């Protein structure tokens, strides 16, 4: 009774844990496919906060259920843990040990009190007072145990490395702790589905459930009717089976009578068969004597045939010997001819090999000559190309020389014509100067014009 009042975590059974494989993953409960919500994410802040609080609670429960490994094996991770964490674990272990001892004492006293109640009707006031005193002393220890658990949990949350180390080192959880985790994960899935479901979807879900219940009710009525029909059919079947059993019994009686009749007929048949066997034996004795006489006659005939065939066999043996000797002679002759042919073939093969070697040498020489011919041909082509190019260059040079000579001759002719023209202009100017005198400005302009004309020419 007193232990039921205490809120001790489910993973501590006398500080000993039954090791099972770790299952820390959050597996949401699978909803019905036909009733799945339309949304896949939470939209409201309140719903997100509710889910975050539940996820944090699941994470804390996972860490608390793994703390039993630290309590049962404090020396396993003592080197890897900081000093404040080790001190908190030791304090937690001391408080837990004291709590378990006092709880066991309280439980023992309650059992003694129950035994006393069965023996006597008067209650022992002193025992009741001691039990109440133990309960009052147990409550502070319970609160201290909770506070130390919260402290260790806070240290684990603040140190992710310690959490990972604990996950890797801890071998498992107790069945109760694993069941609690599984229930929390299922609760998370149910709550997540509940938060995703809108009022319209809830009404649709209720309508769907009502439809299913009505359908189930109709199916149950159909099943009841079918069961009643089945019972009626079974009754009729049993009646038919009884009739068939009666017919089978009558057939068995008839079969028994037939069996007795067949035994009598079999006995009569056996007696008749014995009589017939005696008659057949006598007839077979007579046939056997006749067959013996036939055998003797056939033996004499066989002896005569053997004597006749022996002479024919000797003649055939002689003929066979003669044929075998002829065959041996032919074989020897064939072997001699084959040996001669073999020698001739070997000679031809040696000649063929020599000619083959000569052919290889000739092929090599031919390849060398072909290569030399190709080189000579390439050189001749290059020389012919160079010759053609030189001829073309000579033609270009001749054309250029003739063009230069023609240009030079033209230049000389033009220069001669220009000098003659200047002389004519000067003579004309002298004649005009005698008649009229031009102003100085016009003379300057004429000089400039003449200078421009010379520049253009």
Swiss-Prot record:
The keyword DNA repair does not apply. Its main location: cytoplasm. It comes from Rattus norvegicus (Rat). It comes from the Eukaryota. This is Dynein regulatory complex protein 10. Belongs to the DRC10 family. One of its GO terms (cellular component) is cytoplasm. Pfam families: IQ. Residues 446-457 have a biased composition (Basic residues). The keyword Coiled coil applies.
